[in-house]
Each structure stands twice: as C-alpha cells, then as structure tokens.
Amino acid sequence: MALTPLACVLLLLSMQCYISTLAVLLKSTNSKPWVNEFESIELSCMIESITTTKPRIEWKKIKNGDPSYVYFDNQISGDLERRAKIREPATLVILNATRSDSADYRCEVTAPNDQKSFDEILISLTVRVKPVVPRCSVPKSIPVGKPAELHCLEDEGYPKSQYQWFRNKEEIPLDPKSSPKFFNSTYTLDGEMGTLKFSAVRKEDAGEYYCRAKNEAGISECGPQMMEVYDINIAGIILGVVVVVMVLLCITVGIFCAYKRGYFTSQKQTGNNYKPPAKGDGVDYVRTEDEGDFRHKSSFVI
C-alpha cells in the first residue's frame, strides 16, 4: 500500500523526533555576552535534549588559540578557581570578572548513552574596563598668535577610550564652526588620540581646560588646568633692549676713561725703576773762603 504525502511527512517528523530524543543538543541564550570589570556574568549553556542521566560537562577557556580547562571533573580550575561556579545543568557563572577573562569559552557535554553523544557551543566573552584618570597636559601660558597643543591619554580602558575636551566646563565641539562660541577658533580636535591643537591662539581661548576619557564601561576626567593667553609687548621689548645697550655703552666709556687717566697702570719699585732715598741723616761740610782751609766731609750723626 502506497503512503500518501501527508503520511510521509508525518513519518519523517516522527523519525526526526525519535533521533532528537537520542541526541545531546546544546544552546545558549547569548553567544557574545559582555560585562563590566568586577561584575558577575553568566555564560549560558543549556541542554535541550539528552537521555544520559549523568553527562560529563567541561568548560574550556580559549585565548590566543590555546585552550585550558576552567571546569573539569566537577571542579572549577585554572583562571576561574574560587571566582566561578556551575549553575545546573551546565551554565558557567563568573562572579568577579577581570579584564584577563576576555576570551572564548567552550561548553562541552558528553552523553555516552545518547546516539549523538557529544555536543559543544562556543561563547565569546568581552570584559569592559572603565578608563582610569587620564594624563592631561595643558600649557600654562601662551602668547597671542602662537600655536599650542593640549594632550590627553589613558591606556587602561577597554574598549579603547574616546576623548572629549572642555573649556570652562563647556564641551569643545569637534568642529569649531558648529558652535557660535568657538566659531572663530582655529583648532583641530582628535577624539581618538586626545589631542587639541591650536594653530594660533586668541585671547578668547584662555580658560580652564580638562579632558574626559570615556568608553562603554564608564568615564574618567582629569582635573582642570588654567591656560593663560597674553599679548606680546613689542614697545616694552624694544625699550628694554635700548636700556641694556645704553648701560653697556656707559660701562664701556667709563672703563676707557679710567684707563686713559692711568687708574689701571701700576709701577713696581724694582729693577731699573728703583730710586735710592735722598741723604737726610748726613751733612757735608765744605770750607768756604772765609773759613780758611778747614774742610769737613765726614757724615756723622749727632
């Protein structure tokens, strides 16, 4: 007796259901979960069908292509020891996720009594890390018309942080032309690198600047830093140069005059310049015509 098409369909469905009841089948409610660092996360591994009463359940962590056990022989091991547990029948719960937990995890179930005795599912976990306080660099003072660069950087956040700059608590837009307050400013803002560059600062650019680093896990800010913008006093600079030149000129003339008057010459009383002292203690007597022939030339001291 030939089977009708409806009977064939029913037969195929019944055979499929019979085979399914003899096979272990797994599924997950979320194959790409994410969690913020230090929070809990479930890696869902649900057994849809199985006939074996006590299947073997294993979890492996795969990072950089290298698998390692995190649940084996009914015990948490490896990187998750004392930080995870199994929720029946096979879901892995990480209690305190850290950034090193970002990896692929494979749930494996072996059921010896089932016709299809093995199944596995792969789950990719991402642990998001909040940015730390960024390192900010703001020049303290810049003359009008000169270029200036402000830098902001942090390297702990995951995914990679994006950056915002603020002046006097107001966000600086990426495009200065999009805001009336910054319309005349000549700057470029790189939100990925955290740099704010002025090609020529104006007086209006002075103020308190701070930077914010943000990603999906949170935000962090550095403290405000003051940047002053001052005018260059050309007249004062010229006057200062003139005063310095005049002072140097006066010193030079004074030294020259002193040299000409002999203040810098010295005579040594030695050698050919030595002059013997005059005779003050001796007396020469020479007889004059009135004194006759007497002549006394001896020098004697009274």
Curated annotation (Swiss-Prot):
One of its GO terms (molecular function) is protein heterodimerization activity. Residues 1-23 form the signal peptide. Residues 27-124 form the Ig-like V-type domain. Disulfide bonds join C45-C107, C152-C211. It is found in: Cell membrane; Cell junction; Cell junction, Desmosome; Cell junction, Tight junction. Keywords: Cell adhesion, Cell junction, Cell membrane, Disulfide bond, Immunoglobulin domain, Membrane, Repeat, Signal, Tight junction, Transmembrane, Transmembrane helix. It is a single-pass type I membrane protein. Its main location: membrane. One of its GO terms (cellular component) is desmosome. Residues 257-302 are cytoplasmic. Gene3D superfamilies: Immunoglobulins (2.60.40.10). InterPro entries: Ig-like_dom, Ig-like_dom_sf, Ig-like_fold, Ig_sub, Ig_sub2, Ig_V-set, JAM-C. This is Junctional adhesion molecule 3B. It comes from Danio rerio. The gene is jam3b.
